[in-house]
């Protein structure tokens, strides 16, 4: 389990590396946005990926790193590896958005395509680990990744000590697990809402079952939130802070699309559907935040053609 000191150590390790992203007030939403879309790779994933790569033993890191990702975590691992001057291999789905594939290549990552599901990507990544002795950097199911994501919450509390609600998108659970852990480390009493697509209700199902549930299939406009399950480590952290969870909302693709356009039109922000999930949930009335509220905008890697719709 990630400790408060583990979160603070991650924050120290990210100083001068990750962007200390701002909070901006959006009057129509009556909420603040935490703009993780401003990270060097355009997503919060920079925090967890860099922390995990930094904490690897030098003997392992020097052989190169590998991950499996639909996009943003892959870009983050490639970026982190680039900063350490080591090789990175990113296993991506055949359906990965071009903007995310190019983002990986921008940081020197070697792209390997494998199927369409996270299981396809994981199998290929594990095979490459065995063949090439690369160090695996999981996208969400690892305490170092969770510790890095927890620094989002530390910054929120430092900038907004009276925060009462934080709304977080949910893919594999690394970010929401990090946020609940980071809020606890900061001594905040804020509650957390999770948001996931209607077509990928893995956290909703898992909380109901009391254990991580693997879905047969997922589908959503929010490609970063369609993992088949939440990770065991994130789920354990959520259960440890169960009283902090206010609820989990489900959003439709129509709501996601509207939220992306709203943020572009009203805030001049370029946000991908996964990053707009929190705004979508609030605008659709799917979350019912109490008091001072922060919506985490998790990423901004979206194809410009999206705005031609």
Q: Each predicted region: which residue ranges?
A:
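PLP-dependent amino-acid enzyme catalytic core
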Residues: 1-309
